């Protein structure tokens, strides 16, 4: 059976990348939370 995770770099960046996060209010909240927590990688784009 086909598994649910079929890795694709472009899809990953477009969905969870920095610019995708910045587009919505909720996404900006995600970044703010991760900054407050002290995450070194805010998004998958920062790898």
UniProtKB/Swiss-Prot annotation:
The record's annotation in Pfam families points to: Ribosomal_L34
Q: Which GO terms describe its cellular component?
A: ribonucleoprotein complex; ribosome
GO BP terms in the entry: translation
Name any one GO molecular function: structural constituent of ribosome
* UniProtKB keywords: Ribonucleoprotein, Ribosomal protein
Q: Where is this region: Disordered?
A: 22-47
Q: Does the keyword Ribosomal protein apply?
A: yes
Identify the HAMAP family for this entry: Ribosomal_bL34 (MF_00391)
Could you tell me which NCBIfam families the record lists for this protein? rpmH_bact
Q: What's the family?
A: Belongs to the bacterial ribosomal protein bL34 family.
The name this protein goes by in its record? Large ribosomal subunit protein bL34
């Amino acid at each position: 059976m086909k598994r649910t995770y079929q890795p694709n770099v472009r899809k990953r960046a477009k969905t969870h990348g920095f610019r995708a996060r910045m587009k919505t209010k909720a996404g900006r909240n995600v970044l703010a939370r991760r900054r407050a927590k002290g995450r070194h990688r805010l998004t998958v784009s920062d790898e």
